[in-house]
From Swiss-Prot:
Source organism: Glandirana rugosa
Record-given protein name: Rugosin-C
Transmembrane segments: none
Presence of the UniProt keyword Disulfide bond in the record: yes
Function: Has antibacterial activity against Gram-positive bacteria.
Broad class of where this protein is predominantly found: secreted
Keywords: Amphibian defense peptide, Antibiotic, Antimicrobial, Disulfide bond, Secreted
GO cellular component: extracellular region
Amino acid sequence: GILDSFKQFAKGVGKDLIKGAAQGVLSTMSCKLAKTC
């Protein structure tokens, strides 16, 4: 149903957001360590 497809959509978006946030944190940390930011 509509609710199920919305749940699937929200799950996918959440995963992408978490992935993006993790990558942002990692790149920020690595540039701070390398003093390149």
